[in-house]
Each structure stands twice: as C-alpha cells, then as structure tokens.
Amino acid sequence: SMGFPSFQAYVDHLIRNQKPEDLELMLNKLTTNYTYFMREESHFEFFTDVILPYLLQTKKDRVLSIWSAGCASGEEPYTISMILKEYLGSKASMWDTRVLATDISQNALKAAANAVYDETSLRNLPAGWKSKYFRSAGSPGLYTVSPEIKSNVIFRTFNLMDPIRFRLKFDVIFCRNVMIYFDQETKNSLVNRFYNATNPGGYLLIGHSESLNKESTPYKYLRPATYRKE
C-alpha cells in the first residue's frame, strides 16, 4: 500500500535509506495492536491472589515497581492500575503504585496516552468497573480512562533490544505477546536482561501462547506463562 512492488523492495528501501521515520512507520504497520482490557485474565487473577499479597507483605518501602513492556495501546497498564486500586482500596494513597508502560511504537503510545476505547475493548471488565474507572469520551460507544487511573501510568518509548537502565528494579514485569516476534537468541538475551532488572522474588509474566526454555532461563517456572526470580 506504500507504492512498492513487493515487501522485499520495501525492506531494501528501508535498509538503503535507514531513515528513522520510515522504520517507525513500518513498525507501526507490523506490530499487532489487537488487545483489550483484562486480556488473558488468569494472569490478572494470579497477580491479585498471589503476587499482590506477597508484595504487600514484603515491600516495606511501600513502592511497587511494575513494568508493562510492549504496552501497545495501553489496555494492559491501565488494567494493572485498576486492579491495584481495587486491591488497595483506601490504602492506595499510602503506596507508590505507578506502572511504567513502554513500547517501541510512537503511534501506540499516543493512543495509550489518549486513552480512548470502544465498547469491545471493555467487554471483559468485571461488573461495575466501567462506571467506576471510565468516563464517556464524548461520542456514543467511546470511553476514556478516569484521571486517577491515567495518572498512575507513566508512558515511555523504549526498544526492548536496548540495555535496560531504569532507576528501579521491578517486582513484576508483564511482557505478553511481544516475544512472538523474536527469534530464540533474541528472546534469550531479552529474558536475561529482564532477569537482571527483576527484584529477587519478582515475577515475569509472558503471553499464554509463549514459553521460555526451562533449561536456559534463569527464572523459575511456576505455571504456564508465569516465572519467578528466586
């Protein structure tokens, strides 16, 4: 659709010219943004039933560091924020619960910061959450995330191929349905970088269609798509 006779010709053009905006455009076209709130909800159940009780007991500084890596259009980090709000209730103000959300795609981050979603994105939410955490976005069938949930998420551009140099280590890293694009070697080195950026006792959650090689990963396998740093 961009005036090239074939995909190969397009790739050759990208390699020859190496203009960042061309690459950005390609990434935005290639990376899937099919996502919705509470996607793969068994992860969120585990997060609520197992991970949060553990963190609330052990994090004496009351800082929860959670990273949504490859956050696409924002449903995942906003879902995490809603769960934190539900779980902590009136204690929420006593904790720093800000979620770091990163993506390589500027378009995705723009959509995420804009935080406007349609009815189908919200269909998996528990009863009452829509009225509690969303407002009408002005047009019929469109909703926007409430300011308290929005302000709990920090969006940053980040390429997962780069060294991880954030100030904090993480208690939980969500990197779901992102590594399907990577070959084994790339995946292994990314998982090692994640491991080094995880607090002891912290968790890595990946997509349900993904798995890590139990022999080569430093994380301990807990259950499908759920790993822990011992």
PLM regions: where:
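Conserved beta-strand signature within the Rossmann-like core of class I S-adenosyl-L-methionine
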Residues: P200-H208
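Conserved class I S-adenosyl-L-methionine
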Residues: D61-T79, R98-L100
